A protein has these predicted regions:
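N-terminal helix-turn-helix DNA-binding core of bacterial DNA-binding proteins
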Residues: 2-42, 65-73, 136
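Beta-hairpin "wing" of winged helix-turn-helix
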Residues: 53-62, 69
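Amphipathic alpha-helical dimerization/coiled-coil segments
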Residues: 73-124
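Conserved alpha-helix/loop element of class I SAM-dependent methyltransferases that forms part
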Residues: 127-146
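Class I SAM-dependent methyltransferase SAM/SAH-binding core
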Residues: 147-149, 155-204
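A short acidic, Gly/Pro-enriched loop at the edge of an enzyme's catalytic core
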Residues: 203-215
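A short glycine-rich, Lys/Arg-flanked "PGG" loop and its adjoining helix->strand segment in the class I
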Residues: 228-243
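C-terminal alpha-helical "lid/dimerization" subdomain adjacent to the S-adenosyl-L-methionine
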Residues: 243-299
């Protein structure tokens, strides 16, 4: 009872309710919150500290910055916010200001990538058929996903694609520039309430064992020094019978990809992927190919409750 009372006391203040309402719509840093609410950083920092201590918000460090968001398990926050009137003048003004900031951030991030010449959309940069690849991903994944982690999320495009099918989606990436663009795009599209991004190393995911229903590795492994370790770490966070979907290049002979795009691997065949999946406690269930100048391969695997001794053959479509 005392924990519940402490949470109610923490929420029972106008500024803190406004903070909860904002952070429930997507992760925001202190600077963003100061811009929206028009209050000083020391004042808001005290409010945020109380909300974090009560478990109503979580603080996610990212470099020298930190973002605040409502934890997935904080059902009390959502129950409280559901009772707030949508037409409340202060809350409506906060939403408009937050939307304006999100649009500005998305525009600034996109312009920065274009100015620097960064190939932030790898499917486009390599001339790959993004529409066909996304359709294959959508077909392979369950209709209702539950909890999803997208490892190497980049611009967050996969989170956008699957937003309507997942209860909670988390995109992880090592690049703060990519995360800035992804975070702004998710907020601009109004899906940041249940789709979040976070800085992380693919070999050390900030997630508990068996905590996710689906994990995706899209166009990530060809950059990895240790693809087997990346697959094993993705499998670690999956529940038994959870799904791991790997999307990457099939074997190719385009040496320029190593020089121009820093690829470490010239694609992967079924034998290598199947062996790595098996070593991670997963069984390959299905594989698909998207043909093109560079073929793209999709491998759908299931996390096994017990280890197996030999991989099962993939169903070729």
């Amino acid at each position: 009872m005392e924990h519940l009372l402490a949470q109610l006391r923490a929420a029972a203040e106008p500024t803190r309710l406004r903070l909860l309402a904002l952070c429930a719509r997507g992760a925001l840093c202190v600077t963003d919150l100061c811009d929206v609410l028009g209050q000083s950083q020391p004042r808001l920092s005290r409010h945020l500290k109380l909300l974090v201590e009560a478990g109503l918000l979580e603080r996610v460090p990212e470099g020298a910055n930190a973002y605040f968001q409502v934890p997935a398990e904080a059902t009390l926050v959502r129950q409280l916010l559901a009772r707030l009137p949508e037409q409340d003048a202060a809350l409506a003004a906060d939403r408009r200001q937050a939307a304006r900031i999100a649009a500005e951030r998305a525009r600034a991030a996109s312009e920065a990538f274009r100015r620097d010449g960064a190939d932030w959309d790898e499917l486009r940069a390599l001339g790959l058929p993004a529409g066909e690849i996304e359709a294959a991903i959508a077909a392979l994944l369950p209709a209702q996903i539950g909890r999803l982690v997208d490892i190497g999320t980049g611009t967050g495009r996969l989170l956008e694609l699957l937003a309507d099918r997942t209860g909670a989606a988390l995109g992880l990436d090592a690049s703060r520039d990519m995360l800035a663009l992804a975070r702004a795009r998710l907020a601009e599209r109004g899906i940041a309430g249940h789709c979040a991004v976070r800085q992380a190393d693919m070999y050390r995911l900030p997630l508990a064992d068996s905590s996710q229903d689906v994990a995706t590795l899209q166009m990530v492994l060809h950059y990895a020094e240790e693809p087997a370790a990346a697959i094993a770490e993705a499998a670690r966070v999956l529940r038994p019978d959870g799904m791991l979907l790997v999307i990457d290049l099939a074997p190719h002979s385009l040496a320029e990809l190593a020089a121009r795009h820093a690829h470490r691997w010239a694609g992967f065949d079924d034998s290598a992927i199947g062996e790595w999946l098996l070593g991670a406690g997963c069984a390959l269930r299905e594989a698909r190919t998207i043909p093109g100048r560079i073929a793209v391969r999709l491998w759908a695997a299931q996390r096994l409750p017990v280890p197996v001794r030999s991989p099962e053959p993939a169903l070729e479509l």
